[in-house]
Curated annotation (Swiss-Prot):
HAMAP family (UniProt xref): Glycerol_kin (MF_00186)
Superkingdom of this protein's organism: Bacteria
A GO term, aspect molecular function: ATP binding
PTM sites of type Phosphohistidine: H232
The protein's annotated pathway: Polyol metabolism; glycerol degradation via glycerol kinase pathway; sn-glycerol 3-phosphate from glycerol: step 1/1
Family: Belongs to the FGGY kinase family.
Post-translational modification comment from the UniProt entry: The phosphoenolpyruvate-dependent sugar phosphotransferase system (PTS), including enzyme I, and histidine-containing protein (HPr) are required for the phosphorylation, which leads to the activation of the enzyme.
The name this protein goes by in its record: Glycerol kinase
EC class (word): transferase
Cellular-component GO terms for this entry: cytosol
Cited PROSITE patterns: FGGY_KINASES_1, FGGY_KINASES_2
Keywords: ATP-binding, Glycerol metabolism, Kinase, Nucleotide-binding, Phosphoprotein, Transferase
Notes on activation and inhibition: Activated by phosphorylation and inhibited by fructose 1,6-bisphosphate (FBP).
Length: 502
């Protein structure tokens, strides 16, 4: 028994780091989690201390071993999945970051994004990267760090600095600087990578004046990138052999291997990804085209809709408004609401994501009356998550001319049965909740295990997939459309308010 082999997944998220050990059946054997500091230097800015992230990862690796009794030599391979777009620039020699990591949610580079738009680059960037010019992606964050840290541009040009998203930073640290690599899915979120030609785009690098020397090598999602330095893994030299950005890892963990399959992860934000197969398909309607994953010499593309605020809207109810003591309580309050769903919350706390891409919009509430209760407000906040998902699913169906039959769901807020049922109702399709909600970490584990032969092939993985619960729509068509029409009106009003000048 003691020599059974396992896969470890490191899931480095926006608010915490986790290490999870999986067995051959894809079951969780143990996990350890550690939160780290969110830094808000100014309104709308979000930063992390990259060294604190690294320390938290070391801590959870130890925690997962302690909880399970598994020894480091029983780990066959390590998979990494990470918050995407978050940007670290560090000194090649000392390994010290030259500035905090700028987080995907941060809006501090919005003026740079606006400048690129006004210079007429929207179409060019979209065709090359599949992305919409926005502060969300790494490109403007790198430029900002090089602009705001003394001598950074000069040092970058001399090859003294390295850039990476969090996956790159962790592999660099775990291998003690032996590997400076990223994978297709993370590279595709930098706004510097040509997803058609599968290479860093020289023209974009020139436009942004970002030296190529700082960029990591781009590799597939399932191969050996390097081995852990023994002193970082309790004496073990274990291959790091799977890597994907969190949302693409969840797509893989949900086993959405066929074109047309769609998953939604309800995390801090909510991210809907559709596998579109080996053909790159540019959205006509403000969705992102990205790389789902690259494996066995093939690259599979995806369409993605990003919602910035989902689970964090529930955190806001808890921490900001103190309406609930914990997240699960929101379900109970929502069920106790007896109003007619006339209240709409638009949680545009950091702007609106897909398909609106309005970075100036801010949160708003509509339809309040003297009779509105706390329960109504909480229910409207949960419903706002489902409405935003409908915006994206509708857009995907238009873009791909495909009728989506089922939405595979995972992530923390997917545990909320009220939200899942309302999601099924407002979409009019089945919601299949994964039995194992750890699909992000599981996806990273699958990618790592495949490349070292722990699992043989995709067919073997398909046997491990189970739906935990199916939510079927039960709302009539006219009611569904009436509610959604109210939502569209609320979003429109939110955007009008964002335009008003003093």
């Amino acid at each position: 028994m003691s020599q059974e082999k396992y896969i470890m997944a490191i899931d480095q998220g926006t608010t915490s780091s986790r290490a999870i050990i999986f067995n051959k059946k894809g079951e969780k054997v143990s996990s350890s989690q550690k939160e780290f500091t969110q830094i808000f230097p100014q309104a709308g800015w979000v930063e992390h201390n990259a060294n604190e992230i690294w320390n938290s990862v070391q801590s959870v690796i130890a925690g997962a071993f302690i909880e399970s009794g598994v020894k480091p030599n029983q780990i066959e391979a390590i998979g990494i999945t990470n918050q995407r777009e978050t940007t670290v620039v560090w000194d090649k020699k000392t390994g010290l970051p030259i500035y905090n990591a700028i987080v995907w949610q941060s809006r501090q580079t919005a003026p740079l994004a606006e400048q690129l738009k006004s210079q007429g680059y929207v179409e060019k960037f979209h065709e090359k990267t599949g992305l919409i010019i926005d502060a969300y992606f790494s490109a403007t964050k790198v430029r900002w760090i090089l602009d705001h840290v003394e001598d950074a541009q000069e040092r970058a040009e001399k090859g003294e600095l390295l850039f990476g998203t969090i996956d790159t930073w962790l592999v660099w640290k775990l291998t003690d600087g032996a590997a400076h690599v990223t994978d297709y899915s993370n590279a595709a979120r930098t706004m510097l990578y040509n997803i058609k030609e599968l290479k860093w785009d020289d023209e974009i690098l020139e436009i942004l004046n970002i030296p190529k020397a700082i960029l990591p090598e781009v590799r597939s999602n399932s191969e050996i990138y390097g081995k852990t330095a023994p002193f970082h893994f309790y004496g073990g030299e274990v291959p790091i052999s799977g890597m994907a950005g969190d949302q693409q890892a969840a797509l893989f963990g949900q086993l959405a291997f066929e074109p047309g399959m769609v998953k939604n992860t309800y995390g801090t934000g909510s991210f809907i990804i559709m596998n579109t197969g080996e053909e790159m398909q540019l959205s006509e309607n403000n969705l992102l085209t990205t790389i789902g994953y690259g494996i066995n010499g093939k690259v599979y593309y995806a369409l993605e809709g990003s919602i910035f605020i989902a689970g964090s809207a529930i955190q806001w109810l808890r921490d900001g408004l103190r309406m609930v003591e914990n997240s699960p309580e929101s379900e109970k309050y929502a069920r106790d609401s007896h109003n007619n769903d006339e209240v709409y919350v638009v949680p545009a706390f950091t702007g609106l994501g897909a398909p609106y891409w309005n970075q100036n919009a801010r949160g708003s509430v509509f339809g309040l009356t003297r009779g509105t209760s706390k329960e109504d407000f909480i229910k409207a906040t949960l419903q706002s998550i489902a409405y935003q998902v409908r915006d994206i699913i509708d857009t995907m169906q238009v873009d791909t001319q495909t009728a989506i039959q089922v939405l595979k769901v995972d992530g923390g807020a997917a545990m909320n049965n009220f939200l899942m049922q309302f999601q099924a109702d407002i979409l009019g399709i089945d919601i299949a909740r994964a039995k194992n909600l750890e699909t992000t970490a599981l996806g990273a584990a699958f990618l790592a295990g495949l490349s070292v032969g722990y699992w043989k092939d995709l067919d073997e993985l398909k046997l491990l997939n189970e739906t935990g619960e199916l939510f079927e729509p039960s709302m009539n068509e006219s009611r569904k459309e009436q509610l959604y029409k109210g939502w569209k009106k609320a979003v429109k009003a939110t955007q009008v308010f964002a335009e008003v000048d003093d």
